UniProtKB/Swiss-Prot annotation:
UniProt protein name: Formin-like protein 5
Cysteine disulfide partners in this protein: none
Region (Disordered): 136-209, 273-440, 849-900
Tissue specificity as recorded in UniProt: Expressed in the endosperm. Localizes to the cell plate, a plant-specific membranous component that is assembled at the plane of cell division.
Biased composition (Polar residues): 281-304, 860-876
Organism of this sequence: Arabidopsis thaliana (Mouse-ear cress)
UniProt membrane topology term: Multi-pass membrane protein
Family: Belongs to the formin-like family. Class-I subfamily.
Domain FH2: 433-865
Gene: FH5
Amino acid sequence: MVGMIRGGMGDQNWSRLVFWLILFSGLLVITLEENPEKDEIFLSQFMAPSTGQVNEHMEETSWAQRCWQDSDCVKEAVAEFNLCFPGSKDSRELFGLNHTNLKQTLLDCIQEKGKLNGHNPKYLELLSSMLDIPRRNLATKPGSSPSPSPSRPPKRSRGPPRPPTRPKSPPPRKSSFPPSRSPPPPPAKKNASKNSTSAPVSPAKKKEDHEKTIIIAVVVTAVSTFLLAALFFLCCSRVCGNGSGGRKNDERPLLSLSSSDYSVGSSINYGGSVKGDKQGHQSFNIYSNQGKMSSFDGSNSDTSDSLEERLSHEGLRNNSITNHGLPPLKPPPGRTASVLSGKSFSGKVEPLPPEPPKFLKVSSKKASAPPPPVPAPQMPSSAGPPRPPPPAPPPGSGGPKPPPPPGPKGPRPPPPMSLGPKAPRPPSGPADALDDDAPKTKLKPFFWDKVQANPEHSMVWNDIRSGSFQFNEEMIESLFGYAAADKNKNDKKGSSGQAALPQFVQILEPKKGQNLSILLRALNATTEEVCDALREGNELPVEFIQTLLKMAPTPEEELKLRLYCGEIAQLGSAERFLKAVVDIPFAFKRLEALLFMCTLHEEMAFVKESFQKLEVACKELRGSRLFLKLLEAVLKTGNRMNDGTFRGGAQAFKLDTLLKLADVKGTDGKTTLLHFVVQEIIRTEGVRAARTIRESQSFSSVKTEDLLVEETSEESEENYRNLGLEKVSGLSSELEHVKKSANIDADGLTGTVLKMGHALSKARDFVNSEMKSSGEESGFREALEDFIQNAEGSIMSILEEEKRIMALVKSTGDYFHGKAGKDEGLRLFVIVRDFLIILDKSCKEVREARGRPVRMARKQGSTASASSETPRQTPSLDPRQKLFPAITERRVDQSSSDSD
């Protein structure tokens, strides 16, 4: 049940609480009624209701014989029947009406005579339980209160006695009889007939005692039920007041703050809280004639003490219980029950002091320390110390919200505006806390990248923080501060300038119109020049025509420009220009034809030059003897290295292999396979170059012995290598057109040729269709027709040349790679270009390596001793042997094998 109440204290939860209380009371009443029903059955077995005679079987029992044979008890019971109901003759009616008196008389008799001592206590407990009169029987009586004098009850209809049935409606909720207001009457003494010889008691008095006993039982039951319900409700209220889970928040403020709320005499009416309590209870006036009981009303003075006790136990909630059924809030801090204990509850309380304004609160600079408490403003009050601010408003209350409580740390509020002139600030120094909190002039931002400080490691910034550098605050404000006055002036000037600008009619998109206006101003092109070019076929800048075609208006914009009948001056510069252009028939088709006329000559020159480069490159690559020598050297070297593997015995290879020669290194880690190939080629190419030089001269003065001597001399060997190295290094210049052809975009070249053919076809169709149908005889038409006639032959020749050159390139690719693909020929030029770059680098390294031993030998010869007169018998080593020892060993092995 606590979980159900904590889910919400609305109207639905109040109804649930009342339902559980009614169910609890009904269960208690049903429990109390079960025993009387059993007593009816037992008594009917003991004595017949119709005749009033004792049952023979029950009479035979020992305890029944002892009690029933006592004539005093029987006579006393019969006497009470006759005195109470002298006019009744029917024993069944006597049994039905005086069932309670009979049981009481028998029980008193048995207890007084002591005839049940030592017997089974089961029957004594049964008879004792017969005395419990349930509250339901009292509520079903016709009268609201008994009469002080005995009166004759109304006669009942004859019929068999019925056990008391349960009422259809539950008993009233929360009925309470405080013991302090109506103390119960003293219980009837059970030993009133202790002595059989004493004077008989009057029947009316004895009946009144029994009725008082019934009333006491009912009052005790009701009070117990009410106390349990109140205790349960108090526990639930405290539990629900501490937590806010599931409760609907009331967004309305607690108070409507105004100037009158700050007065001491103002008050808040709390009468509604008692009224709300009053609605939750029912009034019970059982004894309305005597005025013993009263309803729970907030205006009744008899219940003021109990109400104050309840308020003190519940903590004096500041907010009244609303109609939604919300529980009262906790008492504010500082409010205790003792303060209100001595005051009478008049329905109103004094107002609480308002919360101090936010600008009086001082926020701490340190994030770890809480803000210091700010004393509330002193208010004249004679009732004691000022009360703290009220708690948060309940949900649903209207009115403006009170100022929120201060957080742990928030932004500093702006200071109040000062009316006087601002005093000059001194240079910055060791400022105190007040100077730090003072507002500072906003300066221009300095954009940098902040670095997060790491507390675990010491940084240079830790020492800088404690430095002694100070800057002049006035100077930095004057240099880098925002000039508010100048800015306002500039804003005024800008606003006045904008207001002075005329408002133009915009038809184009703002961005398109702005770009077109900038283009017209940049190229200094007027509308008249453009219109004359479109009518007469004059030449215009290519960039201008291309930009106009890119920024051509959409069909909707073009239609608006043509249908515009207003003043031209109201249009913008871009709209005015396009308005004049679109008035010319087929203006943008004329621009396309004009662009073709202006760009055809340049494009044809580029295409012809590219075709020439490709043709020369193919011829150079096919006819280069040195390039073929390199391919031969690489093929033989590769077959030797791949001997015995599936890669060996190759007859050709793709030219991509040339790019891998520099990646294969020797055992020394420096000599590459490309170095080896170059070393082998430069000697043979040097001898060939020397022979070519000699053949160019006259052989009449040259003898064969001289040639042999020169070939075997050391100087001639060095000369051959130099000549061969220069020859190999000149391969890059020999294949110059190949390197240039590698930069040609084959797709771009083919696209340019196709675009020229398409533009020619489009221009021919425009002249033969649109312009011929319009019947226009202008200079533009004549110029375009003449241009088309001259361009047709050139474009057709370019198309034929493109087919021939592309076939030549493809055949060159097939010449080196076998069956090449579509673009394999142009890719071949790229491979050769990259190989020539690597070859030039290798030749440079070989030249540097050959010059290093010569310099070392000369240095050793200059430092040798002058006493060595005998010639050196050791033959001079070949510089290639000094550079590449692996080559020397290989040659020694070959010579030894030849001698064998």
